């Protein structure tokens, strides 16, 4: 989960996270697990309920907010991959050698799912959950056959696929609003970062260590986060924009794309102007204006999350027209700094116009630009079908998904061997589960994930202890 950079109060940041689509989909998944496991327990008993709960857990990772029409395609691959893996582990039983010969190559193939990017990673996790939690099932101790245990597992997966598809339809309207709000928060963070570039020397004199260390790196990171956020929002908001509320949200998303384009276009002008001291007063004024616009965009996002009508603000255009420009340099070749500064001010003015228009559309004071929505919605939506083309490009040593899959398979093999060699009694799946949820494509991401897992485990233990 990407948290946009903000200077908001921690309580407000917490409220945004608590109301986000990440928490909403988590609540939906938890409710589905409770309903399915509880229902199976009442009808078939505790062992069937435990196996069905594992099926639900294995089906959960691909369950993300998605267009209604593509939801089933998003979930079914986890069932197709997870069922044979679960049965294979159950069929092998307690034979440690055969089990190792299954889980190591299966882990390699599962982690190759990263070839499909953000769509494939949840499928990889789902496959690994099917393997790991199948090891944890005490099937033989209960006197239940491998096939019957797998049937309970399949029951849980199947019921959750149905539940998640229905839940996605029910929550679709809320997902649209929250995805747009998250996109607005991301673009507000990018506006703040871009504003900091206007007076980089002034920023370096402050205590903002992030600006001093790597302003360009942070800018690139937030641009990448915004691109991911925009694509996820496009897929949901631009699906069947037929009702007035959907058209309003889709129109606002298209305007957000235009704001992103204005921000990207201003980067070159900022780089050329930041070292011209004669234009520093203008750049300081533009920075303040852009930061004020970022606050207005954040307020708009908060209003969408809370279901309130956003409050309009006064245009900054009059203040921009009163800026005092430095004199032109006659000896300059090409565009002078004064011309670049005026162009930059004009782009900030366009951002002001788009922000005003966004709020007007959100309030219902102005209709969305339906012509833009109709012209672009099919072009921006990602395909929902699966293709084998990413797999064909994997088989070379410099392919990151292939190298990640090899690292993962070696880590799983090492962890499994260590768990068997430990002198005290242990459960091998504990080690394998830790590797699966922590290992990422780079060492830095793995360390970050490890720290998050340690903190999450500690927090969960405290909460569980408090409940007990």
Task: Label the predicted regions.
Residues 397, 449-450:
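Hydrophobic alpha-helical transmembrane segments corresponding to the first two to three helices
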Residues 87, 99, 243-247:
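N-terminal loops that bind phosphate or other acidic moieties
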Residues 1-38, 42, 141-145, 163-413, ...:
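Cytosolic regulatory and coupling regions of membrane transport/channel systems
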Residues 2-11, 26-71, 75-86, 100-165, ...:
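Pore- and pathway-forming membrane helices of multi-pass small-molecule/ion transporters and channels
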């Amino acid at each position: 989960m990407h948290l946009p950079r903000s200077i908001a109060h921690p309580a407000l940041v917490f409220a945004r996270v608590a109301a986000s689509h990440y928490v909403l989909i988590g609540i939906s998944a938890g409710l589905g697990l409770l309903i399915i496991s509880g229902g199976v327990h009442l009808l078939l008993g505790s062992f069937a309920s435990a196996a069905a709960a594992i099926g639900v857990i294995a089906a959960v990772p691909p369950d993300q907010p998605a267009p209604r029409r593509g939801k089933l395609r998003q979930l079914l691959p986890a069932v197709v991959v997870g069922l044979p893996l679960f049965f294979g582990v159950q069929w092998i039983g307690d034979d440690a050698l055969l089990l190792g010969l299954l889980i190591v190559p299966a882990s390699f193939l599962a982690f190759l799912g990263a070839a499909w990017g953000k769509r494939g990673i949840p499928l990889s996790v789902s496959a690994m959950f099917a393997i790991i939690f199948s090891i944890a099932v005490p099937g033989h101790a209960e006197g239940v056959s491998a096939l019957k245990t797998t049937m309970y597992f399949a029951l849980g997966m199947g019921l959750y696929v149905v539940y998640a598809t229905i839940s996605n339809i029910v929550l679709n309207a809320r997902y649209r609003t929250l995805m747009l709000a998250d996109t607005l928060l991301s673009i507000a963070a990018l506006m703040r970062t871009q504003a900091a570039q206007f007076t980089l020397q002034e920023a370096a004199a402050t205590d903002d260590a992030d600006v001093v260390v790597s302003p360009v790196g942070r800018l690139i990171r937030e641009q990448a986060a915004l691109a991911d956020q925009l694509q996820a929002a496009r897929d949901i908001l631009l699906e069947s924009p037929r009702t007035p509320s959907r058209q309003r949200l889709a129109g606002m998303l298209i305007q957000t794309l235009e704001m992103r384009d204005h921000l990207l276009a201003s980067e070159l002008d900022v780089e050329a102007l930041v070292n011209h001291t004669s234009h520093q007063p203008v750049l300081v004024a533009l920075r303040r204006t852009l930061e004020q616009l970022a606050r207005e965009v954040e307020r708009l996002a908060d209003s969408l999350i809370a279901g309130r009508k956003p409050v309009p603000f006064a245009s900054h255009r009059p203040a921009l027209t009163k800026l005092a420009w430095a004199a032109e340099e006659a000896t300059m070749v090409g565009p002078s700094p004064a011309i670049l500064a005026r162009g930059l001010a004009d782009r900030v003015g366009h951002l002001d116009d788009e922000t005003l228009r966004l709020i007007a559309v959100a309030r219902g004071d102005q209709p969305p630009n339906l012509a833009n929505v109709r012209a672009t919605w099919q072009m921006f939506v990602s395909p929902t079908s699966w293709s084998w083309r990413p797999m064909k490009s994997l088989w070379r040593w410099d392919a990151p998904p292939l190298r990640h899959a090899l690292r993962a398979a070696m880590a799983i093999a090492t962890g499994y061997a260590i768990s068997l060699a430990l002198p005290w009694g242990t459960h091998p799946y504990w080690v394998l589960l830790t590797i699966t949820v922590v290992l990422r494509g780079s060492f830095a991401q793995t360390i970050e994930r490890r720290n998050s897992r340690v903190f999450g485990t500690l927090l969960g233990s405290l909460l569980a202890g408090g409940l007990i």
